[in-house]
Regions:
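Extended, histidine- and acidic-residue-enriched regions that form the cofactor-binding/catalytic faces
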Residues: 1-63, 69-219
């Protein structure tokens, strides 16, 4: 899904952004109970991102975005940028950002009333719908998949978990509600949201912390 979204956005912003290849390997240790999972440990993934971003810094790039499409990458990616910023702490001209494509503000259920989930899960209504739109031959018997509610009873605390703690089949959410139509709506909505956000990054003044206030982002 992330690759499709990036491709769409790149077509609109090709003269203003440079898109690196999508990384196929991330931190998926929480899925290792399911046969065939390939995962980089969190430290390996951290080191890989550290090296890649430092490469771009050495070439003179100052605005670097890590655009994420997998929940397991969220914490390591944020930590990687934190480490990089501390190593380059005397610089005031860097904008190092990490964002997840479904977390930039869009609320899909406000665009399509039949979308039921209120947050991303795993192989859920949202993801299953997008795969139905892109590669329907990869989708199995989603109509009979049981509901597995997202979230945890201890929110707002962040509970450590493995996928098997939450789901015997590996999905989280309501995949039985997925549809090709919803998938197209979601892909279009997320692509538009990513493009809007990147346009704000492009318009950053080059050294201000409070530039986000000027651009209308919550601080």
């Amino acid at each position: 899904m992330l690759g499709e979204i990036v491709d769409r956005v790149e077509k609109s912003l090709s003269k203003q952004i440079l898109v690196a290849p999508v990384l196929w390997l991330g931190n998926s240790d929480h899925h290792l109970d399911f046969f065939g999972t390939l995962s980089a440990s969190s430290r390996t993934y951290l080191d890989m991102l550290n090296d890649l971003v430092e490469n771009f810094l050495s070439y003179g790039f100052k605005r670097i975005v890590l655009l994420n499409g997998h929940g397991g990458n969220d914490i390591p990616a944020k930590q990687a940028l934190f480490e990089i910023r501390q190593r380059n702490r005397i610089r005031t001209d860097l904008l190092l950002l990490m964002a997840t494509y479904w977390g930039l503000g869009i609320e899909p259920w406000t665009i399509h009333s039949a979308i039921t989930q209120r947050e991303m899960g795993h192989a859920c209504e949202w993801e299953t719908s997008m795969v139905l739109a892109l590669r329907p031959e990869l989708v199995g018997d989603y109509k009979n998949a049981p509901v597995v509610e997202p979230g945890n009873a201890f929110r707002p605390a962040n509970r450590a978990w493995t996928t098997k703690d939450r789901s015997s089949l590996g999905h989280i959410g309501w995949p039985h509600l997925a549809s090709h139509e919803k998938g197209n709506v979601l892909l279009s909505a997320f692509s538009a949201d990513v493009q809007r956000w990147l346009e704000e990054v492009i318009d950053w003044d080059g050294n201000s912390w409070d530039g986000t206030k000027h651009f209308g982002f919550p601080v």
